[in-house]
Amino acid sequence: MNTNILQTLITAMQRRLAALPQRLRPFTTEFDELPKNLMLTGARGCGKSTFLLHHSQGRRLLYFSADNPKIIGEPLYDLVSSVFMLGYEGVIIDEIHYASNWSIHLKALYDDYPGKIIWISDSSSLVLRDGKADLSRRYVAIQMPLMSFREFLYLETGQIYPKYKLGDTILPTQPDAELLNHFLNYRSYGTRPFYQEKDFEARYMAIIDKILNNDIPFFLPSIYRKQPTCDASHYRHTGKLLNTSCTSHLLMLRLGNRSGKTLSTTLCDGKCRSIRK
C-alpha cells in the first residue's frame, strides 16, 4: 500500500476517535467483547461507526470506509493484506458495499488470515444479506437498531433505566410530566444519537440526500443504464414523493377477501375510523 494512503487513513481514524462523544448510547457500551469477525448493519446515522470505533480502542485496528476516494479502485483483498503486513491486529471497513466483490474478498481474507480481526458495517441489510450465503459460517451478524426511548433518556439524563418488555410490565397510568416531555422530544428527533449536535437537522437532510443520490441508484442500476440522463429528474421526483409521504394526512387501507371484495376501509386523517361494507 502507498505510504501516503496509509497515513491518510490513520489520520482520519485518529480524528474520528478524538471526536467520539463522552456519553455513548447504551447499545454501544453493553457489549463486553465483539466477535473476531463481525457484520454490523443498521440505518444511516444510528451510530455504527461510533460503535466500532469505541470497541477498537486499546487495539491496533485500522478503520476506513470503502467509499473513501483514496482507495477506490484498490482490490479489497490487496488493501487489507497490506494493512495486516504492517502488523495491525485487524481492520474495520465501513460502507462495505462500495468495495467490488466484497463478499468474495472477505471470505478469502478470513481463510488466509485466521488470527486477524475483521469488522465490517453497512447501512443496507440487503447488501449484507446477499453476502451472508458466503459468510454465514465465518462472520457474526449484529443488527443495530435505532435508539430506544430508554437510550434517549440515558443521553438526556445520564440515568440508566432497566429494560422492560411491554407484556410483562405494569405501566403507570399517570407518568411523570418530565418523562412525558422527554418522550415527546424522543418521538420528534431522538432516534439517532447525533440529535445532540447543533447541526443535527442538516445531518438528517444529508442522510436523506445520500439515500436519494447514492443508495437508490446503487440498488437500481438498470434504470440508470437505460436512462443515463435521469439523475436530476430521479432526484426531483423522488424528493417530491418523499415530501408528499411525509406531509400527507390521509391514508387509506383497504382490506379484502380472496374474491377481491372490499370488506372494510380505514381512513386516517388525524383520526382513524373504519367503514365497513
Predicted regions span which residues?
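Hydrophobic anchor at the beta1->P-loop junction of P-loop NTPases
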Residues: 40
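Interdomain hinge/linker elements that couple catalytic modules in large macromolecular machines
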Residues: 2-12, 154-277
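Short glycine-rich substrate-engagement loop in P-loop NTPases that contacts/grips substrate
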Residues: 60-90
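Short regulatory helix/loop adjacent to the ATP-binding pocket of P-loop NTPases
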Residues: 126-141, 155-157
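Structural recognition of the conserved hydrophobic beta-strand(s) that form the central parallel beta-sheet
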Residues: 92, 117-123, 143
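N-terminal pre-Walker A segment at the start of P-loop NTPase domains
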Residues: 1-30
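Conserved lysine of the Walker
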Residues: 48-49
